[in-house]
């Protein structure tokens, strides 16, 4: 038995939703610990695609799903998601969907600030999703954010919203030259959300720790990817939370000793949405082919993902930052049909070889990938369910990735469906 944290190893969009959905079958509790509705986790069951943005993917397996204190929650989006899932026949109640009373709430003024800032930056924008995630985390750090425990106290909530709107409206109108927000409308709208969500609000830390004491298996579901981490990512082209495995404790209220396994989700190639350096990016027919075959469009934004070869310099940093105990390789099938495959094993920058991912984006922008080339395969592998049945060149590719990464491959995904997966070793077995 083990408690597992699942993290993205690249720039997000690695296929975490599918893997979490599969692992949830053996889990008792599934927990989100950071991020907001800027994440989109896609699950395909019996040909039906379901995308969740806030509710943990485990809800489709009727598991106890928890939204930790490290998550920033847009209650409107959350309730829209609840209603959509209920309409699909998914059971959601106050027993299987629990929200931390300490979780921060995204307010309309956060979204207004997000849009106003991006508009003012113009060409220098960082590519935010505009959902108010960053401004909400800012208010949290400034100790003036609204938590669920505050939302459920009408007098406290009223006072906090009016004070916040006074400050935000000054910035919106005077500095950004944007429209103000209406505190009365916000209070009325969010009071209705409070009525529906109140039964779901609990102390998630207490629930989780009691579950662990009772021998329940917990799956912690990360959002985005390691290199979007606010501290360790390609700053400032990052998200506003810590996406690495170490944040699972702070973001959900459990101790480090209660996390046994760290499973990194590795897409068989690399993708990135939005701005920022991308050393292995392919801006040719191969890149277009991968983009089209892999259907590389953001589940949350619909934006086209930039595509490139697998980057082991990037992944070395990921393994080091997260302490990976295993990996799941996704979208291996997308590489089928290519004559040869490249794996980036180092960077070359102004005559020097770099083996570690640089923090300075000016340096990263100058980095050229040093490639190791391997033969590809032509066979359709979407029906393969055992590692030994994969084409020899596919096995060689995976073995080389495992060797370079220094962490065992435990799961291989060869298609979007729940059944298009092979388990090399059960992560819950440790």
Swiss-Prot record:
IMP binds at residues 13-16, 38-41, 129, 143, 224, 239, 303. Its EC number is 6.3.4.4. This is Adenylosuccinate synthetase. Pfam families: Adenylsucc_synt. GTP binds at residues 12-18, 40-42, 305, 331-333, 413-415. Substrate binds at residues 299-305. Mg(2+) binds at residues 13, 40. Pathway: Purine metabolism; AMP biosynthesis via de novo pathway; AMP from IMP: step 1/2. Homodimer. Disulfide bonds: none annotated. The active site is at 13 (proton acceptor), 41 (proton donor). Its cofactor is Mg(2+). NCBIfam families: PRK01117.1, purA. The lineage of its organism: Bacteria, Pseudomonadati, Thermodesulfobacteriota, Desulfobacteria, Desulfobacterales. HAMAP family: Adenylosucc_synth. It catalyses: IMP + L-aspartate + GTP = N(6)-(1,2-dicarboxyethyl)-AMP + GDP + phosphate + 2 H(+). Binds 1 Mg(2+) ion per subunit. PANTHER family: ADENYLOSUCCINATE SYNTHETASE. It is an enzyme of class 6 (ligase). Belongs to the adenylosuccinate synthetase family. It is found in: Cytoplasm. It comes from the Bacteria. GO terms for cellular component: cytoplasm. GO terms for molecular function: adenylosuccinate synthase activity; GTP binding; magnesium ion binding. Keywords: Cytoplasm, GTP-binding, Ligase, Magnesium, Metal-binding, Nucleotide-binding, Purine biosynthesis. Its main location: cytoplasm. Plays an important role in the de novo pathway of purine nucleotide biosynthesis. Catalyzes the first committed step in the biosynthesis of AMP from IMP.
């Amino acid at each position: 038995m083990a408690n597992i944290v699942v993290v993205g190893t690249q720039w997000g969009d690695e296929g975490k939703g599918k893997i979490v959905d599969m692992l949830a079958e053996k889990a008792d509790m599934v927990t989100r610990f950071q991020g907001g509705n800027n994440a989109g986790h896609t699950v395909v069951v019996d040909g039906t695609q379901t995308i969740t943005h806030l509710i943990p993917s485990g809800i489709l397996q009727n598991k106890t799903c928890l939204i930790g204190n490290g998550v920033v929650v847009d209650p409107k989006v959350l309730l829209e998601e609840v209603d959509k899932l209920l309409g699909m026949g998914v059971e959601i109640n106050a027993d299987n969907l629990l929200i931390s009373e300490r979780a921060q709430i995204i307010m309309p003024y956060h979204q207004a600030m997000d849009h106003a800032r991006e508009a003012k930056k113009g060409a220098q924008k960082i590519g935010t999703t505009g959902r108010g995630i960053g401004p909400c985390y800012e208010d949290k750090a400034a100790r003036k954010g609204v938590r669920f425990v505050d939302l459920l106290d009408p007098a406290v909530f009223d006072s906090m919203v009016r004070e916040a709107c006074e400050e935000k409206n000054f910035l919106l109108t005077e500095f950004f030259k944007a429209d103000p927000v209406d505190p009365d409308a916000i209070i009325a709208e969010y009071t209705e959300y409070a009525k529906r969500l109140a039964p779901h609000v609990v102390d998630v830390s207490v629930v989780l720790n009691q579950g662990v004491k009772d021998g329940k298996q917990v799956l912690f579901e990360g959002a985005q990817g390691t290199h979007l981490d606010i501290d360790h990512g390609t700053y400032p082209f990052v998200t506003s939370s810590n996406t690495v495995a170490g944040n699972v404790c702070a973001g959900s209220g459990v101790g480090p000793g209660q996390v046994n396994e760290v499973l990194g989700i590795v897409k068989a190639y690399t993708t990135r949405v939005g701005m920022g350096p991308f050393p292995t990016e392919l801006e040719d027919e191969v890149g277009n082919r991968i983009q089209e075959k892999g259907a590389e469009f953001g589940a949350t934004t619909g934006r086209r993902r930039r595509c490139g070869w697998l980057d082991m310099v990037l992944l070395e940093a990921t393994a080091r930052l997260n302490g990976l105990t295993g990996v799941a390789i996704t979208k291996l099938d997308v590489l089928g049909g290519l004559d040869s495959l490249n794996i980036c094993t180092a960077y070359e920058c102004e005559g020097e070889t770099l083996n570690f991912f640089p923090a300075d984006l000016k340096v990263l922008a100058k980095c050229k990938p040093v490639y190791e080339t391997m033969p590809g395969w032509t066979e359709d592998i979407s029906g393969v369910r055992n590692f030994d049945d994969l084409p020899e060149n596919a096995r060689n590719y995976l073995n080389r990735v495992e060797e370079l990464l220094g962490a065992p491959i435990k799961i291989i995904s060869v298609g979007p469906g729940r059944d298009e997966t092979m388990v090399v070793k059960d992560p819950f077995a440790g």
